[in-house]
């Protein structure tokens, strides 16, 4: 829904931004998240959707080498809302009246849809108290929350992919094939895998790409 959360310095230097949606790697259309890791080795350019427009990002020749040097693993990270899982007793917000499942919608009247945006917004309120707008059981309530000097609320967030999907943050793609169609789909998958395999070999054996440094693999 909201693209990917980008904080890896190599990706940022290459021109990626949080919110980008990956549309294609080279000439290969990307429809599923798992395909990014499949095609990123050998990638020369990536097409993203940003603010409703398509943008082509040309990758540096040693892109994979840079990622390996940085120890990059989680490159394109999912974005999700801020849902409360629990509040530890040691937190200054332990008595704020939060409950598991509370969806924090914003701070001080400002709507904030994604958790990564909360992280940056809280930096403006170090050591202060903020009013949080919270959705609980289809009702909106307000709670005062304390931000510590490290710009944190000390609240454990809930990570629930199923719930995020139900809320419309993620799309799950399921393809059903008939018996006959499965052969065609299998052949296309085989051909795509073979082409991608040789593309990866070409990148790995080209010293300029430094792809050999990332033989351990990357997680998109």
Where does each model-flagged region fall?
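PDZ/PDZ-like domain micro-motif
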Residues: 5-21, 35-38, 88-102
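Alpha-helix boundary recognition
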Residues: 12, 37-41, 123, 206
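Exposed loop and linker-edge segments at protein-protein interfaces
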Residues: 15, 23-24, 29, 97, ...
């Amino acid at each position: 829904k909201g693209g990917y959360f980008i904080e890896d310095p190599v990706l940022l230097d290459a021109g990626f931004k949080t919110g980008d949606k990956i549309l294609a790697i080279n000439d290969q259309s990307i429809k599923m998240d798992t395909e990014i890791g499949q095609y990123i080795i050998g990638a020369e350019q990536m097409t993203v959707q940003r603010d409703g427009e398509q943008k082509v990002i040309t990758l540096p020749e040693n892109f994979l080498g840079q990622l390996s040097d940085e120890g990059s693993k989680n490159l394109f990270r999912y974005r999700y809302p801020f849902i409360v899982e629990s509040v530890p007793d040691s937190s200054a917000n332990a008595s704020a009246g939060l409950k598991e499942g509370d969806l924090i919608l914003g701070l001080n009247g400002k709507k904030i849809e994604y958790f990564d945006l909360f992280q940056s917004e809280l930096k403006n309120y170090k050591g202060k108290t903020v009013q949080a707008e919270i959705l609980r059981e289809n009702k909106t309530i307000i709670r005062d929350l304390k931000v510590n000097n490290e710009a944190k609320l000390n609240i454990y967030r809930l990570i629930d992919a199923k719930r995020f999907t139900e809320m419309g943050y993620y799309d799950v793609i399921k393809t059903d094939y008939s018996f006959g169609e499965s052969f065609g789909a299998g052949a296309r998958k085989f051909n795509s895998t073979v082409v991608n395999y040789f593309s990866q070999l070409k990148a790995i054996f080209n010293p300029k790409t430094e792809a050999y440094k990332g033989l351990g693999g990357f997680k998109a």
